């Protein structure tokens, strides 16, 4: 089945840009504000928001924008940030600038973990609210049943903490999105395939059984952020609802894919999430500026494809990735996967900045030849066994209530007055109504119920 077409000025004919991989495609929404790519961490800083513009150009050049619902996103509000982040920290972000940073009381910047990784740059607060607003807009489309899959490549900044930035991340858009989704979904699975451990998300939901956090990452105790060992499995009510897959340098395509599928499949069957949040950090690719894995673009995408195959609603966000040309290749390829389309290898002729993809101009360059694979078969099998043991402890999906008491509040600030009112109305419903609502959610596997 043919996809969209471009007009070839040489042959005077319409040429297909891609083909659909199946007769049915999910409803996919694509959330982006071009302004977010104009911010600048600094000349020598590895994080380059320009990668987002490059991604958007490539997505459009392949014609993918014609088969998705496109949304120009808004900025998140202060009250929305306060659903997770502390008031002191949000106030600091909203007021600090390169001009006044050195005039702040001694120790202020250090207290908020400002430094080389997380610098103060021009219009920092505007940047954080733009990428966060995109994730929250995507979340609303899922809540309102207007999207099956919602994409925000500018999001996925998984290191940010309640009171401080960390690892290039200032506001944790993932945590904020999940907190909103928990009002409508009993169980959410978070999957992170960034090179670095998704510590900020794990920390936020470490004591709840309603969010299962799963992270595949490099770990040796010293590699940033220094967390993500197999022993980190959650605590209190959330014990066994966090799972980490610590890997060594140089893991290859087959090893990664096989390990990923062998863990994700039984986890989904056991935990029975009603929605999946997928973080697609591109620094796990080979040849990344800060990377140490040997993954090719199609291998990374195979993980996304596998998660999608379960047919659950998905919020898909970006994350790390410090070689912009490969970041844009990956996220364009995965945009295609999420739309069930096959993209040709040749980069379209009409894309702006096409020279960035030279000299091969391929969507699928070979990226698997840089590092020695230090992940032995025994190591990977030991990790797999440990992970499956943790999954067996779940003993089936937890039964949950859908009221305010069951939304994680540890280390989370008060909700806005409007949201408190909504939750109060939910609490006033009878226990019988709540029970019926949960039974309906269990029967519908999607579990997507929007309260008006």
UniProtKB/Swiss-Prot annotation:
InterPro entries associated with the record: HDAC_PDAC (IPR050284), His_deacetylse (IPR000286), His_deacetylse_1 (IPR003084), His_deacetylse_dom (IPR023801), His_deacetylse_dom_sf (IPR037138), Ureohydrolase_dom_sf (IPR023696)
Regions of compositional bias (Basic and acidic residues) in chain numbering: 434-445
A Pfam short name: Hist_deacetyl
A single BP term in Gene Ontology: cellular response to starvation
GO molecular function: histone deacetylase activity; histone deacetylase activity, hydrolytic mechanism
Places the protein is found: Nucleus
Keywords, ordered alphabetically: Activator, Chromatin regulator, Hydrolase, Nucleus, Transcription, Transcription regulation
A cellular component term, taken from the record's GO annotations: Rpd3L-Expanded complex
Stretch list, region Disordered: 428-452
Active site: 197
Enzyme class: hydrolase
Miscellaneous comment in the UniProt entry for this protein: Present with 4890 molecules/cell in log phase SD medium.
Function of the molecule: Responsible for the deacetylation of lysine residues on the N-terminal part of the core histones (H2A, H2B, H3 and H4). It is apparently involved in transcriptional activation.
Record's protein name: Probable histone deacetylase HOS2
Source species of the chain: Saccharomyces cerevisiae (strain ATCC 204508 / S288c) (Baker's yeast)
Lineage of the organism: Eukaryota, Fungi, Dikarya, Ascomycota, Saccharomycotina
Gene that encodes the chain: HOS2
């Amino acid at each position: 089945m043919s996809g969209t077409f471009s007009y070839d000025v040489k042959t005077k004919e319409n040429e297909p840009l891609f083909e659909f991989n199946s007769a049915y495609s999910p409803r996919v929404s694509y959330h982006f504000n071009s302004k977010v790519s104009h911010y600048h961490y600094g000349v020598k800083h590895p994080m380059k928001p320009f990668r987002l513009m490059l991604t958007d150009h490539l997505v459009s050049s392949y014609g993918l924008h014609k088969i998705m619902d496109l949304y120009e996103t808004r900025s998140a509000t202060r009250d929305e940030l306060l659903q997770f982040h502390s008031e002191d920290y949000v106030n600091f972000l909203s007021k600090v600038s390169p001009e006044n940073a050195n005039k702040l009381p001694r120790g202020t910047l250090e207290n908020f973990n400002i430094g080389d990784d997380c610098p103060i740059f021009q219009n920092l607060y505007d940047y954080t609210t733009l990428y966060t607003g995109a994730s929250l807009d995507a979340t609303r489309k899922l809540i309102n049943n207007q999207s099956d899959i919602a994409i925000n490549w500018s999001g996925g900044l998984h290191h940010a903490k309640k009171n401080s930035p960390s690892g290039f991340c200032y506001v944790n858009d993932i945590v904020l999105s999940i907190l909103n989704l928990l009002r409508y979904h009993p169980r959410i699975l978070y999957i992170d395939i960034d090179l670095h451990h998704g510590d900020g998300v794990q920390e936020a939901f470490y004591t709840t059984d309603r969010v299962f956090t799963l992270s595949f990452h490099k770990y040796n105790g010293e590699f940033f952020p220094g967390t993500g060992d197999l022993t980190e499995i959650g605590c209190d009510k959330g014990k066994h609802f966090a799972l980490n897959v610590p890997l060594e340098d140089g893991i290859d395509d087959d090893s990664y894919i096989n390990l990923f599928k062998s863990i994700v499949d039984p986890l989904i069957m056991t935990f029975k999430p009603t929605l999946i949040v997928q973080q697609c950090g591109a620094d796990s690719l080979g040849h990344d500026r800060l990377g140490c894995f040997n993954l090719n673009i199609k291998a990374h995408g195979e993980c996304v494809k596998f998660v999608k195959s379960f047919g659950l609603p998905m919020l898909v966000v970006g994350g790390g990735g410090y070689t912009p040309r490969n970041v844009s290749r990956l996220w364009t390829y995965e945009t295609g996967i999420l739309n069930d389309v096959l993209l040709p290898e040749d980069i379209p002729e009409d894309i702006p900045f096409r020279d960035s993809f030279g000299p091969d101009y391929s969507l699928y360059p070979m990226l698997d030849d840089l590092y020695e694979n230090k992940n032995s078969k025994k190591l990977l099998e030991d990790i797999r066994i440990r992970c499956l043991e943790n999954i067996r402890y779940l003993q089936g999906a937890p039964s949950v209530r859908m009221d305010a008491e069951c939304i994680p509040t540890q280390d989370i600030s008060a909700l806005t007055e409007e949201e408190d009112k909504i939750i109060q109305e939910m609490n006033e419903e009878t226990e019988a109504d709540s029970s019926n609502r949960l039974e309906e959610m269990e029967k519908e596997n999607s579990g997507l119920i929007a309260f008006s």
